[in-house]
Amino acid sequence: MNTIAKTTWLAFLLGFSALASAGHHEGVMHDGRDIKHIGYSQMGDPAAVLTVETEASHALRPGEVRVKVLASPINPSDLLQIAGKYGVDPVLPARPGSEGVGRVTEVSDDVKALSVGQLVLLASGNTWAEELVAPAAGFLPLPDLGPVGADVIEQLAMAAVNPLTALLMLTSYADVAEGQWIAQSVANSAVGGYVI
């Protein structure tokens, strides 16, 4: 695996572990607002088990940032996990969503890597929500793109899971050198498109 692939995969894993705990803030003071997220307490047909839930928004702890979720796609893997058919079962109750894009709205005083107004990729976990509060390491900063429209936001929301899957497939599971040919099935899938 090349250095870029290792770094990207490590950032993805760090984001997953940081965001996996997002929303669990026992003993942290309420900041006066309520936020909505999607949740489920049993696995099954997503149409039957998903609910819109409301919880208190919490004040930031050291090292945390608040991110307004701008878009989060519905991936087949999300639906399979909700249905209990993914191979890895979540701890229930759970919050779905494996990727997305958001804008930083608040940072704790000790966070220097992210700033208010910055666009970030939601690396993984709990992304079907209005906002996320989690350690800064759980978000991948994007460069300043200037003003962006909804079409760009929608594309950015899908920039973590499938591109990284394609990258890892080409760098970790095959020894493909520049100029070599590969054969691929399901080339019209999202992962297939990134491989091409």
What are these regions (language model features)?
Residues 124-138:
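A structural motif shared across PLP-dependent enzymes of the aminotransferase-like
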Residues 1-9:
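Bacterial N-terminal signal peptides that target proteins for export
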Residues 22-30:
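Cleaved targeting-peptide boundary
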Residues 56-73, 83-127:
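Glycine-rich beta-strand-centered segment in the early N-terminal region that forms part
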Residues 148-159:
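Short pre-catalytic strand/loop immediately N-terminal to key active-site residues, enriched for Gly-Thr
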Residues 160-196:
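Mid-domain Rossmann-like dinucleotide-binding core that forms the NAD(H)/NADP(H) cofactor-binding site
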Residues 15-21:
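N-terminal signal peptide c-region/cleavage motif recognized by signal peptidases
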